[in-house]
Amino acid sequence: MTTKNAIIMAAGKGTRMKSKLVKVLHQVCGKSMVDHVLTQVEATHMANIVTIVGHGAKDVEAALGDRTEYAVQTEQLGTGHAVLQAESLLKDADGMTLIVSGDTPLFKAETFEELFEYHQAKGAAGTILTSKAPNPQGYGRVVRNRLGIVEKIVEQKDATKEEQEIHEINTGVYCFDNQKLFAALHEVTNDNAQGEYYLTDVIQIMKNQGDVVAAYQMDDFDESMGVNTRAALAQATKVMQQRINAQHMENGVSIINPDDTYIDAGVKIGADTIIEPGVLIKGHTTIGEDCFIGAHSEIHDMVIEDRVRVTASFLEDSIMHADSNIGPYSHLRPQAEIGEHVHLGNFVEVKKAKIGNRTKVGHLTYVGDATLGQDINVGCGVVFVNYDGVNKHHTNVGDSAFIGSNSNIIAPVEVADHSFIAAGSTITDDVNFHDMAIARARQTNKPDFWGRLPHEPENM
């Protein structure tokens, strides 16, 4: 089997993005553009992967880690100069070398494999991946002769009027014989309008040496989309989102309105789950089978087991076990764990708390820094008061306890199994097994107090 290598171009500053963030680290559906590219390159089982870094090199290296080797382009002298920086790492490598830009997040591994196969079938020294662009403005044009053989690639600024009318464009992806690539790069000059060392000049050098140069035209132009502006980033995100949603639907997920549903690339969703419009599912979220995610819910880095129902709520970095439900208008903050068959109603906030099976927290409640057992009823308006102004404190509530409405639980306290807290209580001490705690002022009625009012209210 022929050895395969890859070079990912990620050294550019991306000035048109007008951003402090390195261009290739801008995200498309939850992953940086260069991460998308690297993931697809990895899927083609490369022997060597080298990423060319320059602007923001440390940030790119931190983002990609040890999944790739790195070569640094200290001066931005063109694409040919950039590739040449990988020579020290690949000079002894045989076989084929793929070159792809780190700002093209929509390429698929299958396309790279097709390019490799075509390159080998043609016995080529270099093969260009091309596409037909509806609007080729800004792209390098692929110039062919009457027999359809590639003559050259000409950049937009160097193209004649006739050449600018060509719609077949260079996608910026190439497959080269590795040894011939670096030999040709040493012959590239910067005698052009930009004063740069163009990688595309390698094509003409190879042709002049009598080597075969081929061009493989891909069908899907969107896949070759490069991102240089915020508008292009939005367009790439739209295409990627359509692709992600289509894959989930193919796997048995019902997405009511795919055009109004945002799902990150790392999300996993089980079959027969229904997702309503306006939903955002982000990060490394996993959703089980037969779930319902209601309209306008936002979910980040969650584990949601089977048959969970989420209604118009915000969930982040927590776990919901099977057959539980939440919402509308509730919030799971980080490190919450919700047991099976739990009911969390409207306007409930849970933070760094564990709630046991079959417990019900109906509405207007804050549960923070607490462990609640099984079969507990938490009434309306209950607050777990966890902060003393300096430190957070923990509360434990045992199985089958009952907490009446409008109660304040002042941590740290222990509320035992089968205990009862009367409505309106402020609990500052432990509540023992089978006890009822009442911590409120006794009601006093004042007879005939109405007549003592300074004046009689109108309409009474």
Swiss-Prot record:
UniProt-annotated binding residues for Mg(2+): 103, 228
Question: What GO biological process, any one, is recorded here?
Answer: peptidoglycan biosynthetic process
Q: Quick check: keyword Cell cycle in the entry?
A: no
Tell me where it resides.
Cytoplasm
| InterPro entries named in the record | Bifunctional_GlmU, GlmU-like, GlmU_C_LbH, Hexapep, Hexapep_transf_CS, NTP_transferase_dom, Nucleotide-diphossugar_trans, Trimer_LpxA-like_sf
Query: Which GO-annotated molecular functions does the record name?
Result: glucosamine-1-phosphate N-acetyltransferase activity; magnesium ion binding; UDP-N-acetylglucosamine diphosphorylase activity
Q: Does the keyword Magnesium apply?
A: yes
User: What Pfam families does the annotation carry?
Assistant: Hexapep, NTP_transferase
PROSITE patterns noted in UniProt: HEXAPEP_TRANSFERASES (PS00101)
> Which residues are responsible for catalysis?
363 (proton acceptor)
Q: Which residues bind acetyl-CoA?
A: 386-387, 405, 423, 440
Cofactors needed by this protein, per the record, are: Mg(2+)
Q: What is its main location?
A: cytoplasm
The organism's superkingdom is given as: Bacteria
Question: What are the UniProt keywords, alphabetically?
Answer: Acyltransferase, Cell shape, Cell wall biogenesis/degradation, Cytoplasm, Magnesium, Metal-binding, Multifunctional enzyme, Nucleotidyltransferase, Peptidoglycan synthesis, Repeat, Transferase
Sorted alphabetically, the Gene Ontology cellular component annotations on this record are: cytoplasm; membrane
Enumerate the residue ranges of region (Pyrophosphorylase).
Answer: 1-230
Functionally, this protein is described as follows: Catalyzes the last two sequential reactions in the de novo biosynthetic pathway for UDP-N-acetylglucosamine (UDP-GlcNAc). The C-terminal domain catalyzes the transfer of acetyl group from acetyl coenzyme A to glucosamine-1-phosphate (GlcN-1-P) to produce N-acetylglucosamine-1-phosphate (GlcNAc-1-P), which is converted into UDP-GlcNAc by the transfer of uridine 5-monophosphate (from uridine 5-triphosphate), a reaction catalyzed by the N-terminal domain.
On assembly, the entry states: Homotrimer.
User: Which family, according to UniProt?
Assistant: In the N-terminal section; belongs to the N-acetylglucosamine-1-phosphate uridyltransferase family. In the C-terminal section; belongs to the transferase hexapeptide repeat family.
The protein, known as? Bifunctional protein GlmU
